[in-house]
C-alpha cells in the first residue's frame, strides 16, 4: 500500500496485511487525496491521544471532515519526557490508567479501521500499539520489532529534537528494545 500521508514520519499499520490499526505521528497536513484514500480504505475512526493544549497548537485537519469519526482521547498520565532510561518503562506503565483502557476498548471494538496518533507517534502511540498487538495475540518479538521501527523512522527527528533541547537526553528518548520488553513483562500480568 502507498503511504497514507506525505508529511508524517511514523505512519504504518501494526498488523501485517491489515489496515485495522494504523499508528502515526500527528497528521497536521492532510491533502484532499489523502483524506479520500483514508475513506476509501475505511480508515474512518480517528483517535487523537494528544492533550487539549497539543491539539490546539497543532490541530489535525481530519477533525472537521464529516467522513471521519474524530475522537479526542488524551493520554495525560505519564505524559512527560523521561529523565533517565529507567523512567521510560515506568512512564509507559503509568499511562495505562482507566481512561487509556477505555480508549483501547473503543479502538478494539470499533467497526471501521482506526488511525490513532499522538505528537511523535512514539510513546503514547507505542503503548496503545503494544496493547493492541498483545490483545491480537502477537508475540513479544513482533511487538518489540514494531516498536523499534519507530527508532529508525524518527531517528533524524529525535536527534534534532535533542540538539534543540539540551536538557533532553537522546539515549533516553530514542526507543530501545528494553523499554518495550519491560512494559510487556508488566502487561502480561494485566487483564487488558
Segments from the language model and where they lie:
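Cys-dependent protein tyrosine phosphatase-like superfamily
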Residues: 1-115, 127-192
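Ser/Thr-glycine-rich phosphate-binding loops at phosphate-binding pockets of nucleotides
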Residues: 120, 124-125
Amino acid at each position: 500500500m502507498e503511504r497514507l500521508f506525505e508529511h508524517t514520519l511514523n505512519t504504518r499499520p501494526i498488523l501485517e496485511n491489515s489496515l485495522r490499526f494504523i499508528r502515526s505521528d500527528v497528521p497536521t497536513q492532510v491533502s484532499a487525496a489523502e483524506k479520500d484514500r483514508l475513506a476509501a480504505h475505511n480508515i474512518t475512526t480517528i483517535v487523537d491521544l494528544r492533550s487539549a493544549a497539543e491539539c490546539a497548537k497543532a490541530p489535525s485537519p481530519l477533525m472537521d471532515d464529516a467522513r471521519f469519526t474524530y475522537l479526542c482521547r488524551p493520554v495525560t498520565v505519564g505524559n512527560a519526557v523521561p529523565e533517565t532510561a529507567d523512567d521510560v518503562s515506568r512512564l509507559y506503565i503509568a499511562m495505562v490508567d482507566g481512561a487509556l483502557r477505555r480508549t483501547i476498548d473503543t479502538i478494539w471494538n470499533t467497526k471501521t479501521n482506526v488511525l490513532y496518533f499522538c505528537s511523535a507517534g512514539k510513546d503514547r502511540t507505542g503503548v496503545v500499539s503494544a496493547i493492541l498487538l498483545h490483545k491480537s495475540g502477537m508475540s513479544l518479538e513482533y511487538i518489540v520489532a514494531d516498536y523499534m521501527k519507530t527508532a529508525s523512522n524518527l531517528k533524524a527527528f529525535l536527534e534534532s529534537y535533542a540538539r534543540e533541547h539540551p536538557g533532553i537526553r537522546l539515549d533516553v528518548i530514542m526507543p530501545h528494545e528494553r523499554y518495550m520488553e519491560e512494559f510487556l513483562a508488566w502487561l502480561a500480568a494485566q487483564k487488558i
